């Protein structure tokens, strides 16, 4: 396909060797970028209330970034280093310290992740970032920070909408199922759901017009 794909590689799947192997396979699969985070493996979701978010050492994660870059054959795949220092409550200084080390290890982009309900923390972090690597943001918990505001920072080059489509789908499914149960039939929701033809078209298949 023509649209670049960003692959979430979690923590790199274990050791440096695992990370390098995954990076090689993902490059061969024509991924546009892979994102690796500095949490310990296995990990919990960054947004899980009360979740534990221990991080690996800077040296260990820098090794994973270097391994991912060295595994590339074409050099066309972008490696995004995601630091969870803000998620872990370690503060902006630690997030910046880690980002600097990851850039030195070869990261093409830096992702600062925050679960703060306001954009203040992430805005301050980006403002203080002095590295050359551009920044990626994930405005899941701080939706008030829009793209024009990010562009104005001059350092943000990618925005990842990590779960908005999943949450939209969940809400739509719940509403449709509720309507079916209330009306005891599917007629009431027919104009709110995608035609079967459209579903198959998304898969590159064709269906007779009558379906």
Give the positions of each predicted feature.
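Alpha/beta enzyme core
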Residues: 1-140, 145-160, 168-174, 178
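Extended, intrinsically disordered, low-complexity segments
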Residues: 70, 165-211
């Amino acid at each position: 396909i023509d649209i670049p794909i960003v692959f979430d590689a979690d923590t790199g799947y274990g050791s440096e060797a695992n990370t390098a192997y995954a990076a090689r396979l993902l490059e061969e699969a024509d991924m546009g970028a892979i994102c690796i985070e500095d949490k310990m493996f296995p990990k919990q979701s960054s947004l899980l209330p009360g979740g534990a978010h221990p991080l690996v050492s800077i040296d260990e994660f820098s090794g994973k970034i270097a391994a991912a870059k060295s595994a590339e054959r074409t050099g066309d795949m972008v490696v995004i280093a995601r630091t969870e220092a803000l998620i872990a409550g370690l503060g902006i200084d630690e997030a910046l310290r880690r980002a600097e080390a990851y850039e030195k290890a070869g990261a093409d982009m830096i992702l600062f992740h925050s679960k703060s309900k306001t954009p203040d923390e992430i805005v301050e972090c980006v403002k203080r970032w002095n590295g050359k690597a551009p920044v990626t943001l994930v405005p899941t918990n701080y939706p008030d920070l829009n793209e024009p505001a990010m562009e104005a920072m001059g350092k943000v080059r990618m925005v990842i909408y990590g779960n908005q489509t999943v949450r939209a789908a969940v809400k739509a499914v719940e509403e449709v199922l509720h309507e079916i149960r209330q009306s005891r039939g599917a007629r009431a929701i027919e104009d709110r759901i995608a035609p079967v033809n459209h579903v198959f078209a998304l898969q590159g298949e064709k269906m007779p017009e009558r379906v």
